[in-house]
């Protein structure tokens, strides 16, 4: 499809399909902003959060958000939580510093993969995975290796549509402080846009890229969006090319 379509028209057409969505990792920075944008855009008829604890919201806009509390160590016991969703967004993730090497791999690979398997079995058609710039299953760095491994494993599940997002350093104000991240964000925030955009990206831009992508017609089963593509798609306002 060569011609561009108005983004507003794509969103409206998508809303008319009354699709349901689940979010994994809604308590994290990206998941939190993603939920906010989903509700503001009104793209889905049903929104479900799947997590290890119930989240508390004061705003009226969140009153119809469904929540499924699961034990990620026993996900097979919670298969019903993953049933009946058209679209899924996975923003699960921790760090080696917080969870240790084994704990990091457990969350970022094992939990993500098992969740994807249950989502596929439950009827999910479009699975969106938040990964990382430089993800490579052959990498010597554990973080990038695990990210690359889970990307490949989820692809093997053969979702009707599978979108992988590889942002650079996420520019945000975390509710949870991680040592060194403030300094990194400050560094990238002071660089010229042309250089910083190749290595960093605001969380809200990542989220908007995810949602702009979900409403546009797919042109292939597996989509891999690197940092520059995330910037371009996340800043689109008027039109999109599929």
Swiss-Prot record:
Subunit text: Monomer. Forms homodimers during oxidative stress. Interacts (via N-terminus) with elongation factor EEF1A1 (via middle-region); the interaction is direct and competes with EEF1A1 binding to guanyl-nucleotide exchange factor EEF1B2, thereby inhibiting GDP for GTP exchange and reactivation of EEF1A1. Interacts with nuclear transport receptors XPO4, IPO5/RANBP5, IPO7, IPO9 and KPNB1 as well as GCN1L1/GCN1 and LRPPRC probably through their HEAT repeats. Binds NCOA5/CIA.
Cellular component GO terms held in the UniProt record: cytoplasm; nuclear envelope
Matching InterPro entries: NAD(P)-bd_dom (IPR016040), NAD(P)-bd_dom_sf (IPR036291), Semialdehyde_DH_NAD-bd (IPR000534)
Main location: cytoplasm
Active-site residues, as the UniProt record annotates them: 143, 147
Chain sites annotated for binding NADPH: 27-30, 52-53, 92-93, 143, 147, 178
Protein's UniProt keywords contain Protein biosynthesis: no
Superkingdom of source: Eukaryota
Record function comment: Represses translation by preventing reactivation of elongation factor eEF1A. May also inhibit nuclear import by competing with nuclear import substrates for binding to a subset of nuclear transport receptors. Has additionally been proposed to act as a redox sensor involved in cellular oxidative stress surveillance.
Lineage: Eukaryota, Metazoa, Chordata, Craniata, Vertebrata
Required for interaction with elongation factor EEF1A1: annotated span: 2-25
Species of origin: Pan paniscus (Pygmy chimpanzee)
Protein name: Protein HTATIP2
Keyword Ion transport belongs to the record: no
